[in-house]
Amino acid sequence: GSVVFSYKAMGYWPAVLAGLATAFAYLGVAAWEGPAFSTAINYVVEIPKAGKLWSIKGDDVYVSVACVSIIASLIITYLNYKGAKQAAVFQTIATGGLIAVGLVFLTGGAFMGKPEYTKPLFTDFKGFSAVLLMVPAMFVGFDVIPQSASEMNVPLKKIPKILILSICAAALWYMAMIFATSISAPASVRLNGVIPVADAMAFNFGSPVWGKICIIGAICGILTSWNGFLYGGARVLYALANAKMLPEVLAKIH
């Protein structure tokens, strides 16, 4: 991954910095997954608000909601602690759930949506700029693939092809979901909704139940990225320790 690439290109310390930057990037995203998970769960089943901690920009933070994220974090951590095989099985199941719900959403948008919901196709440069700023974040995490190369039962020469293919597939998936959201509901529903994608699916299918089904698919997506970042972060630290760039205790495989 980034550690080996940086080491061969620039030497020891750039490789250390690249590895630590990658690990902290994974940690940052993994920290975001917790609140995202509890928000999604709250859409499906309302979480009781108990034990107010503080408020941030008008939004209250409660112990009960935080506990949901903490429990999910412990489960994901345990799966990764058990080993790569268990994490891979979990990843496969969650990815299947995400794809299934996404295909239902896309099919519903294509057959029941209305083209006029997409108008105006363009407004001003502000909207374009906002999306452009978000796009790089959508592609964070694909370097987990080379990080896990040592545990993949795949010829090393095929890994670059898998990486490029996964990025292209993700780009197509993002575009498909944007299309489905745009054509499934008018702008008023999308802009005023709590979670626009779920609200668009509920509107298109004519029942709030479908919004909850959409969120279940989103939860699968959150769990896959959460699992992937923990897996990738652990492998980055292992690579650094194995190269004597971090304490050797991190290079031990239990």
Residues of each region from the PLM?
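TM-loop-TM module centered on a large, flexible mid-protein loop between adjacent transmembrane helices
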Residues: 1-7, 11, 43-50, 164-227, ...
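Hydrophobic transmembrane alpha-helices that form the core helical bundles
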Residues: 1-73, 78-81, 219-239
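Membrane-interface loop-to-helix entry segments
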Residues: 41, 64-112, 122-127, 163-168
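Interfacial helix-capping/hinge residues at the ends of transmembrane alpha-helices
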Residues: 2-3, 142-146, 198, 234
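Hydrophobic, membrane-embedded alpha-helices of multi-pass small-molecule transporters
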Residues: 69-75, 121-184, 210-230
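Structural signature of transmembrane alpha-helix termini at the membrane-water interface
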Residues: 31-34, 38-48, 78-85, 104-114, ...
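Transmembrane helix-loop junctions in multipass membrane proteins, especially transporters and channels
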Residues: 47-51, 81-88, 110-118, 139, ...
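Juxtamembrane helix-boundary/capping and inter-helix hinge elements in multi-pass membrane proteins
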Residues: 8-13, 150-159, 165, 241-247
